[in-house]
A protein has these predicted regions:
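N-terminal targeting signals for export/organelle localization
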Residues: 1-51, 170-173, 192-196
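Conserved redox-active cysteine motifs that mediate thiol-disulfide chemistry
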Residues: 76-96
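Solvent-exposed loop/turn segments at secondary-structure junctions
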Residues: 78-83, 109-114, 135-136, 164-166
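Thiol/disulfide oxidoreductase modules built on the thioredoxin-like
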Residues: 118-126, 131-191
Length: 196
């Protein structure tokens, strides 16, 4: 377990250096959202249970998604974020290819649910979108937008990527890596090669 956390931490450091630009100030939590904290444990920790209602009215529960999928990606965004809007078409291509194994949920802690619904309708994005409490973004350390939190089939936060991913091949590589049955071993071996 310690090797797994160390390997994932080193991977995060390496990937953060490759991150695109994030945009936007982190919104401060409102008093009403303070009661909705997740007790998030960070990279390498188990993601706490969370439930959201999508713009389509569907209730998504993390534990249920992880029974069906090998990877869940929480993408924090807001409508006036130019880098979020650049990332979405690329994310859509990757989602279309990997949706059997990967679920993406675009979480918006800034805009009203009606605005998110209108945005999704005009953008034709097929992955679920939902409003979320601002406290979730704060607790998960979202310092800029977009930020994506990758959660593996065991509920472990395996990557936090700050900034836009604007190359579909990057999504393909991440999805291939984190949906592989032996991804922890592959990452550990890759990192071991780097530090030799």
């Amino acid at each position: 377990m310690i090797k797994r956390i160390a390997a994932l931490s080193l991977l995060l450091i390496l990937l953060t250096g490759c991150a695109g630009k994030g945009d936007g100030e982190l919104p401060k939590p409102t008093p009403e959202s303070q009661s909705e904290l997740l007790t998030y444990t960070g990279l390498g920790g188990v993601m706490p249970e969370m439930t959201v209602t999508t713009t389509g009215g569907e209730t998504l529960k993390l534990s249920e998604l992880l029974q069906e999928k090998k990877l869940v990606v929480l993408n924090f965004w807001f409508e006036d974020c130019p880098w979020c809007l650049k990332e979405f078409p690329v994310m859509e291509l990757a989602y279309h290819r990997y949706q059997q194994d990967v679920e993406i949920i675009a979480l918006n802690p800034v805009d009203a649910p009606q605005a998110i619904s209108a945005f999704q309708a005009k953008s034709s994005l097929s992955f679920p979108m939902a409003a979320c409490p601002r406290s979730w973004a704060v607790e998960m350390g979202v310092g800029g937008y977009p930020t994506s939190v990758f959660i593996d089939r065991d509920g472990v936060v395996c990557l936090i990527h700050a900034g836009a991913i604007t190359n579909v091949e990057t999504f393909y590589t991440l999805f291939e890596t984190f949906t592989a049955d032996d991804y922890e071993r592959k990452i550990y071996n890759s990192i071991s090669q780097l530090v030799r």
